């Protein structure tokens, strides 16, 4: 089990490093910067992890925190971007995105094709989150409690930032593709489609609970 978790940690470290090219969103929503962490940082290197023996030693001793962080993240722990606090930022900014990207005067007229529209959705959401100083981490609570998270404790936040980036990019493309049915779509129609489409993609409505089982006829 430990070997699997350590392997997942190393894979996620590579994914985090590859997402460094999108550093703008990290500055917008990732509190890791407050703790001096870059998305391009290799957490394994920071903690002195080298060969297999060192990895095993770390997992056995100080590495328990890393393994636990990954285990909690991958075993159903509520994702940071799904927290009610951050969800309010995203849903609020979705209205701004729909208004901006449905106006043909915005984004140099490039929103009349799915690629241009998806870029507009992504960039407008990034700008709105930055304006509202949205963060995946409640820094106000940390200051109130006088907390100073370590790099290991920040690992789940970095992972969730990458996950949110992936969802955000995908939903920008999905909404653009589904709402821009043709180049002559009306601006009001486009805006009315973008808002629910993007929100539903990022925060899908959970399926209804299954119906109760029928009564057992044999007990009558």
From Swiss-Prot:
One of its GO terms (biological process) is nodulation. The keyword Transport does not apply. Pfam families: Nodulin. Transmembrane segments: none annotated. Keywords: Nodulation, Signal. Belongs to the nodulin 20 family. This is Nodulin-30. It comes from Phaseolus vulgaris.
């Amino acid at each position: 089990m430990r070997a699997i978790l350590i392997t997942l940690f190393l894979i996620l470290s590579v994914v985090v490093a590859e997402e460094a090219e999108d550093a703008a969103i990290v500055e917008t929503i990732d509190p890791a910067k407050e703790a001096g962490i870059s998305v391009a940082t290799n957490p394994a290197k920071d903690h002195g992890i080298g060969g297999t023996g060192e990895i095993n030693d770390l997992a056995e001793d100080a590495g328990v925190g890393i393994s636990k962080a990954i285990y909690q993240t991958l075993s159903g722990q509520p994702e940071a971007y799904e927290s009610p606090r951050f969800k309010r930022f995203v849903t609020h900014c979705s209205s701004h995105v729909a208004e901006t990207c449905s106006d043909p005067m915005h984004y140099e007229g490039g929103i009349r094709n799915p690629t241009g529209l998806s870029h507009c959705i992504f960039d407008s959401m990034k700008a709105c989150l930055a304006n509202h100083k949205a963060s995946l981490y409640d820094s106000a609570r940390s200051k109130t409690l006088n907390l100073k998270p370590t790099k290991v404790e920040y690992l789940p936040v970095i992972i969730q930032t990458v996950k949110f980036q992936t969802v955000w990019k995908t939903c920008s493309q999905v909404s653009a593709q589904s709402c821009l049915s043709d180049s002559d779509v009306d601006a009001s129609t486009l805006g009315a489609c973008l808002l629910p489409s993007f929100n539903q993609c990022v925060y899908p409505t959970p399926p209804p609970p299954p119906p109760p089982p029928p009564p057992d006829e044999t007990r009558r």
